[in-house]
Amino acid sequence: MPTELQKERELTKFNPKELNYFLEGSQERSEIISNMVEQMQKDPILKVDASYYNLTKDQQREVTAKKIARLSRYFEHEYPDQQAQRLSILGVFDPQVFTRIGVNLGLFVSCVRGNGTNSQFFYWTINKGIDKLRGIYGCFGMTELAHGSNVQGIETTATFDEDTDEFVINTPHIGATKWWIGGAAHSATHCSVYARLKVKGKDYGVKTFVVPLRDSNHDLEPGVTVGDIGAKMGRDGIDNGWIQFSNVRIPRFFMLQKYCKVSRSGEVTMPPSEQLSYSALIGGRVTMMMDSYRMTSRFITIALRYAIHRRQFKKKDTDTIETKLIDYPLHQKRLFPFLAAAYLFSQGALYLEQTMNATNDKLDEAVSAGEKEAIDAAIVESKKLFVASGCLKSTCTWLTAEAIDEARQACGGHGYSSYNGFGKAYSDWVVQCTWEGDNNILAMNVAKPMVRDLLKEPEQKGLVLSSVADLDDPAKLVKAFDHALSGLARDIGAVAEDKGFDITGPSLVLVSKLNAHRFLIDGFFKRITPEWSEVLRPLGFLYADWILTNFGATFLQYGIITPDVSRKISSEHFPALCAKVRPNVVGLTDGFNLTDMMTNAAIGRYDGNVYEHYFETVKALNPPENTKAPYSKALEDMLNRPDLEVRERGEKSEEAAEILSS
């Protein structure tokens, strides 16, 4: 007998596989990813199942190391873009493996590429075999115990010794200890260290250096002290560590010198823009945008599949069957916006990825040619990318955290089971909201240049959304966001002129969020092709309604939307969009092309046999043969203890009282 999910799947009027071509950017890329998924779920070392959720911290570390060793065999046959695609998939079902490799191939390699000369990049990556996970293993040494978001406040020092042509790396005090460094505890042989450049007594600010941590025998280098951070909220498969340096000497050419250079005689050439030193972080933020799409798609798929199967309560006493969760308006209001968000995240991730690659190529070409005009133009593009990636990283990682937990709650008690993935995923995910740019700090930092630019442009103000029909006009929706951003910028500017930007922090975060939503909405509608208009446009409008409602006070404050239209979003427009999306839910979730291994949730399987899979999973991992617990004696002793009078030897009984009082 077909399940509820299978019945609805048969009614889908479009091909989910072709929809996946839209989500992944092309048919070729979609098919490559499908082939990689098939490889990994058939690989006995790489595949995951529900037993993954029972692993201890030590087991996670060991299993992760074995998986990295196995992946190295795949990487030997793949180009960097293929490796990136494989890692992106891994991030869905095994994020700790993805991160443990990503710190090496993402952050370390990106740092060397972004800050090193072509020769340095070739030496530390291709020549060493790092792209094939051979030779050396890198980590990224930016964060310190006392400094994270304020990179310019980093206190590790790199002092030039002109006599020996070396830099001396030191940790001057406990607060300067490198902290949270992924891979440092056990894996990494080298670290891209952010340290203060000191030459002839002058401090030139924070620059980057490649510092060996371990020799070819994997023993620590002299002067290097490393420790394990220990248990964390999530991602225990990653060996995060701390590092201290005591007079560690490295050759002068271990400093990455694409922009800032130090000559043999100690002459320092400074970069055209300090922001260029942080290019590695932009790559990480772009990756997190793709992570947001993939992780949101995973958990909204699980929750919606469960909602199609699960029935609860009857609408009328005369009904013979209970109502599906998904047919309750509240359930749609809770979950459909995150389904829409996954689709918009996909568009944003693809755009950022393409823009970053093009910008990096332009910058590399300009620097190699030594053309100042081209370098300046590339720097402008890099700054735009910094703002866009910062807005999207912060906003979308926040929303993904919300998506995972809202999806969990929408599955009721079953969402709390480890075997349905929500708990581990949430614990693993939320670090994205604080690493590589704490979301609040990052949002404020990228909003400041946005506000300055907006203040240079003519003010945009006035009513935009005057009727419900305006909510179905993408151009007017984008214009509404433009007006909100323009109004906020002027209010922020008026305050900041006297009191500085810090006091406007909440408004700056709001600017960053609204800019991200504007970017996602505008880009999504522009990317929709005619054949997908009927299926996808309702998702875009539904997402816009959700954001207009969540930030309704801002749009009302600046007179951008009338109170009547604002009310009708919730009472008329949003419910009508939900009705359009509802018949397509199975096809839209199937469009993510997630196999059962990738969802790894008993209640979210493709076939919709929710209770059967869930019960069998629980029985398989917790065999019911022996129902007596290892700690049963403690319970038995408690239950079978003598009553209180016996334990008090009858000393407080009436009989004892008579004897003692006579």
Curated annotation (Swiss-Prot):
EC numbers on record: 1.3.3.6
One Gene Ontology MF term: acyl-CoA oxidase activity
Listed Pfam families: ACOX (PF01756), ACOX_C_alpha1 (PF22924), Acyl-CoA_dh_M (PF02770), Acyl-CoA_ox_N (PF14749)
Keywords: FAD, Fatty acid metabolism, Flavoprotein, Lipid metabolism, Oxidoreductase, Peroxisome
A GO BP entry: fatty acid beta-oxidation using acyl-CoA oxidase
Pathway: Lipid metabolism; peroxisomal fatty acid beta-oxidation
Biased composition range(s): Basic and acidic residues: 642-655
SUPFAM superfamilies: Acyl-CoA dehydrogenase C-terminal domain-like, Acyl-CoA dehydrogenase NM domain-like
Record InterPro entries: ACOX_C_alpha1, Acyl-CoA_ox_N, Acyl-CoA_Oxase/DH_mid-dom, Acyl-CoA_Oxase/DH_mid-dom_sf, Acyl-CoA_oxidase, Acyl-CoA_oxidase_C, AcylCo_DH-like_C, AcylCoA_DH/ox_N_sf
Transmembrane segments: none
Region feature Disordered, mapped onto this chain: 642-662
Cofactor: FAD
Protein's cellular compartments: Peroxisome
Enzyme class: oxidoreductase
Annotated catalysed reactions: a 2,3-saturated acyl-CoA + O2 = a (2E)-enoyl-CoA + H2O2
An example Gene Ontology CC term for this record: peroxisome
Chain coiled-coil ranges: none
Family to which this protein belongs: Belongs to the acyl-CoA oxidase family.
Subunit-level organization: Homooctamer.
Protein name: Acyl-coenzyme A oxidase 5
Name of the encoding gene: POX5
